Amino acid sequence: MESIAIIGVGALGKRHLQSMVELQDQYQIYAVEINEEIIKVLTAEFPNVNFIKTVEELPNELEAVVIATNSNIRRLLFEQLINHSTVKNIIFEKVLFQKEEDYHFVRNKLNELNIHAWVNCARREWDSYKSLKNELNEFNDLYISAIGGQWGIGCNAIHILDLIEYLSGSEIENLDIGKLENNVVESKRKGFYEFFGTISGVSGKCKNFNITCIDESVLPFRIEITTEKSRYMIDEGNNYLLVSDEESGWQWKRREFKQVYQSQMTGRVIKSIIDSGICNLSDYESSMKLHLKYILPLIEFFKANGMEENLCPIT
């Protein structure tokens, strides 16, 4: 039986694993985790998964691997993986890496070893966003705003930036972090940091976007999209979308907008990748370009705030 694996089964990694076990009748599933308490709990929950502590215990051949570790150790584990196993496909969690050199190193190794890779900015896999993208295709101009209180803009903005590229059908042309506040704070994950303020830019027919995180605020996270003929307000957490246009007299109409959880998604994505070689996630090369547009100015931002040089301590 062929094998698939996940490296890192902490909070998010567990969600990946919950979906991967849908494939347990077709593949041997391996999970790499060093935390013995996590292994103990998950072994009881997933008795058919092979839990191991090191990458070197993985099979020599793997159809697909999810690397769901923190960003600061992801390159190291990638190197251990490719030095030990022949891997056909990899899904990386975001934020990919903290150092610019890691992006190029991994890209070169993927090309050298002919490994197909994607990055898990998962909104591209939501049916609701697929439908919305089709709806927005008829418009010439988009203006997008994402705003909320204390929603973790550092680690999560890459999701919204990827979504903007997806909805606009274009790469982000410029990205401005000049409106970020100079109050870097420790995140919930030890050794990583967060910040507040606004990230803005342009992406093709998206003439302007603003991504804002407000400190000391309980404002729910919302995404608003304005076109030349309509307005949309998306509440992902409560699974609805409001839309208004001239035809409705600019009155809001409510529609279902279903959020897809990671525990419902990973198995399906892996199956699509193995069977057809494609999925809706951004490929590594495209996501690398976007990550660097985001990471490089943040390295300077963190340096200006007294942090280690040439490092972006987000995950």
Regions found by a protein language model. Give the residues of each.
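Beta-loop-alpha module in the N-terminal Rossmann-like domain of NAD(P)-dependent dehydrogenases
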Residues: H16, F46, N50-K109
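A short helix->loop->beta-strand "cap" motif at the edges of active sites that frequently abuts
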Residues: D25-Y27, S85-N89, L113-I115
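A contiguous active-site-proximal alpha/beta segment in oxidoreductase catalytic domains
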Residues: A64-I67, N72, L96-A157, L161
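NAD(P)-dinucleotide binding in Rossmann-like oxidoreductases
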Residues: K205-R268, C279-D283
